[in-house]
Structures are given as C-alpha cells and as structure tokens.
Amino acid sequence: MMAAAPIQQNGTHTGVPIDLDPPDSRKRPLEAPPEAGSTKRTNTGEDGQYFLKVLIPSYAAGSIIGKGGQTIVQLQKETGATIKLSKSKDFYPGTTERVCLIQGTVEALNAVHGFIAEKIREMPQNVAKTEPVSILQPQTTVNPDRIKQVKIIVPNSTAGLIIGKGGATVKAIMEQSGAWVQLSQKPDGINLQERVVTVSGEPEQNRKAVELIIQKIQEDPQSGSCLNISYANVTGPVANSNPTGSPYANTAEVLPTAAAAAGLLGHANLAGVAAFPAVLSGFTGNDLVAITSALNTLASYGYNLNTLGLGLSQAAATGALAAAAASANPAAAAANLLATYASEASASGSTAGGTAGTFALGSLAAATAATNGYFGAASPLAASAILGTEKSTDGSKDVVEIAVPENLVGAILGKGGKTLVEYQELTGARIQISKKGEFVPGTRNRKVTITGTPAATQAAQYLITQRITYEQGVRAANPQKVG
C-alpha cells in the first residue's frame, strides 16, 4: 500500500513505461477507452525512481523487518530500493496498520511489494482466532479477508489517473488483472490530499493490478507529493482506509483516547461494523451522548466491545447507536461507557466469586465474568478489594479506596509507571498508590486511592480490577511467573 512518485534525474523526462500487454497485441485506435497499461509520457528518465506508499498489518511487519532488521536490509540490497516503515505504534488513522514507503525504480517497487504481499498472506494462525481471555490481554484479531487485499495510499492527483474519465481506467485495470479495485470515497466538502486504493483478489491478480497502478503513479508528476509515513501530526482530514463508508478516517483528536484504549482493552477487528445498539434505559440527554460517543470512538478504532464480557442487556440495547456529538469529550465518554458496562453487569446477577452486589456498582463482578472466573471468592483481592467509597471534602468528587496485594502493584504501575498514567488519561480520574512498605493495617496490601467524578472513579476502578484479574489468571496458569 504505497504511493509512488517520480524523482527527476538530470532534468530528463523520457519515460520507459511498463507494458503488460503481450508483444503481439494490436494497438487500439485513439478513440477507444484508455488501456490500464497505456504508455503516456512519464516524468523521469530511464534511471528514475518513484515512491510507493502502502499499509502493512501489524502481524506482518515483524517478518518484513526480520530479526535485527536483517530481512529488510537484505531486501533493500537485492532490489536497490529504500524502504521506510512507521514506528511500531504509529498506525495509519483508523487502523492498526503501519505505513511503508518504498523508493526505487519501477522494477524495484514491484519486487518489494511482491515480497510484502507474500508476508501479508502468511497470517499466523494465532492472529486469526479469538480466545475468551481478559479484555486487558492484548489481542491481534485481524479480518481474514485482509490477506487477499493490497492497500495503496496515493495522492489525490494519482487517484484521478487511476480512475480515469468516467471510471474507464479503473475498469480496464480490473478487466486486465482480474482483481477488484476500489478507492476510498471522494468527499463533497474538504478535498483530501490522498486516497486509499484497495485491491482485492488472488495473488497473481493483485500483482498485475499493482503493476498497472504503479504505471499511473509513474505518469503523475505529483505522485511524490505525500511522502510522510507518520500521520500523528497531520492536521485536517485523512482518507478512510476502507473503500466504503465515510471518506474520512478518524480525526486526530479522537485517536489519543482510542489509542490509549488499545493498550487497555485489547484489540479485535471490527471492520465493516457500522454501529452498536446503544439506546440505554435510564440514560438520556448528555449521558447518552457521552456513552454513545465512547462506543463510536472505540468501535471506529477497531475495538470489539462485545469481547468485554459485559454486553448490555436486551432491554437496554434495543435501538441503533445514536449519533455522537462532535463536541463530546472522548475521555469522559469512555469513562461513562465503562461505568455503564459495570452497572449493567451489576444488575445481571451473581458470579462465581459471589454476588455482584458485594462490590460497588458490580465492577468486580464484571471483572469476574470477563476473565473466566479467575477472580474467585478465595482471592485476597476479592475478600477485601473495596476499602471505602466517600465524597471528597468539598463534596464535588468521589473517593474510592482499593486494597491491592503488594505483589500485584507492578501490574497496575506498568513499566516506568506507563500503565498507571494511561489509566488516568483514559478515565480522567486521579490514581494514587501508597508508598512501598505502607500497607493496609493487618495486611500485605497497598492502598490505591481513586479520586474523580462518579463515572471516572468507577471506570478507573474497573480497569484496575481487570488488570489485577488478568495478572492473577496469568500467574495461576504459569506458577513460575513472579512479580
């Protein structure tokens, strides 16, 4: 999925286009529809180079890079191309795919892309299946159809050449290659700098289609106008990676909260899911907007909320997802969403570890259901998790205190305190952990104090108990794991 652009050499402009037609094919009259592989004057000399920008699923990136970067170095040496990938967590907006920019001759672009396509087709079996695990365990479930797709990002000008007058060129590309070629939607309002081309088919069909698309890149003088591999700081709208739906990918201001949710809730692909049922009984006005906004935010970034094990009751989920207000605060919306799920779980009844009513708003009961009963009645955390819930001195905020076993505090903190910071950013609550050696009297438990709005404190409490529950489950399955 890359976009290729010409680099002029010594001011020469004579082109050497690729001709996919057999040598004995007859030339068509000028008035006939354009061939997908037609040979218009190109913008570079015989030694000219171009750029191709493509999307690479996260599961394939490692095999393309290789151990210590050996594979990608060897690929560059063999093809003469230069290959750049966005950083491991720097995804194209609205996806969990990395951006790859290839620079080289037409032959090199085709060779490198052929290698990348092969690695994408090698989807590991454990990536394609979903297991009933804690929502805090990272997941990489991918749409199985992705292995048959190529996603190329091209400048808007190149997209016009690929489509052709009245769609004649893209039709010819499909006819000659046998692949299905679609472009992301063209917006009525703000023009996009780039469009995403999705090619679907068998390996050989996709290979031919990509060669024809690279020809169009070769013909466009502006095809090298968008050479960024990171979209983290791009202002304004960005093209949707999918050919259907909105022309635009997720906006930059939504991504930070959704990205934080990625690490906290675990990833599961939701491609093609248009909406969640979310007419919640007992919620109206701003509350409903916040909750539905959170659903939209997380779903649009690819997170399957159904895997939380906290599905809303049928009575509470009887309609289509309300349109999220553009002004809604994503962090507050996510907090409200988590709080709502926990409340629904509380109302659903008891769990293996005890009754839901034992714990404030059912959040620990929810955690039990979501983690296959790892959080049983014998758990020290289950026995004394909630130390107290009260209002702050000024009465404006809730204060929740939780007891956490000393040997599990590290799971909440994360490396360098990263997990704790993410929890606070996602929920808007303030989370404090007692100093090392300061225990709840008579125990070896540290005290965790959560301060914030009711929704924020409950969301933070829920995330903390989920993390602890997951860590306990991992240790139960692997007794050798410590700390």
UniProtKB/Swiss-Prot annotation:
GO terms for biological process: mRNA processing; nervous system development; regulation of alternative mRNA splicing, via spliceosome; RNA splicing. SMART domains: KH. It is found in: Nucleus. Its main location: nucleus. Keywords: mRNA processing, mRNA splicing, Neurogenesis, Nucleus, Repeat, RNA-binding. InterPro entries: KH-I_NOVA_rpt1, KH-I_NOVA_rpt2, KH-I_NOVA_rpt3, KH_dom, KH_dom_type_1, KH_dom_type_1_sf. One of its GO terms (molecular function) is RNA binding. Coiled coil: none annotated. Interacts with PTBP2; the interaction is direct. This is RNA-binding protein Nova-1. It comes from Macaca fascicularis (Crab-eating macaque).
